[in-house]
Amino acid sequence: MAQLVEPVSNLAETKPRVSPGIGICLSGGGYRAMLFHLGAFLRLFELGLLQKASRISSVSGGSITSAKLGLEWSRLKTRDDFFAHVVEPIRRVAGTTIDKPAIVEGLLLPGKVADYVAAAYRKLLFDGATLQDLPEKPEFVINATNVETGTLWRMSRQKMADYKVGEIDKPTLPLASAVAASSAFPPVLSPFVRRVEPSQFSRRYADTDALLKDISLADGGVYDNLGLETVWKA
């Protein structure tokens, strides 16, 4: 009878520990997801549960709502505040077609379609806000897919990162660009190209500088449409 060389470890002891707290994941799905998550956020706010969240992870259409919530977080004291600063702006977006005009502009004018999508988000929701305008707590994580590595590219106040490429601390990426990257549905709305240089990375995991320049990003749902990974992975 075969014998184990070493005792079998308890699975619970070897799995990465998840920090205690409430994590909220927002899936993709275009405007439908944007509005669904808006209603969910409102109800959680009314119940006093949203304020207890530790991390909020979003993908694609969910990132539109999540980023606006994060930007307005410090102003949300009452239900009326929530309607004024989050619900009404998102409703206005729902009544605006963004993708079709951006596609036409991308075909007829210089620049990529995703750049025109970002410009629309900037005008409608975010103005000049960047990832640094998100609150420290809860942590908002906006997810896209790195087309070059096929893995997750996360964007937050703390960092932008891909475990195959590296990490950039305290990024100043515009919120509109982060949301445009997260919702860059292929093939028409993607890629969103983020201009970066190897020197911007505080930690490097890639073997070649080619992966550290001009990161090509697509809809976060290509990798993980539920936005689960960045809730249980720090």
What is each of the regions a protein language model found here?
Residues 19-25, 30-115, 120, 156-157:
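Patatin-like phospholipase
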Residues 2-22:
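N-terminal regions that are enriched for targeting/export leaders
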Residues 32, 96-99, 104-107, 134-233:
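Active-site gating loop/helix substructures
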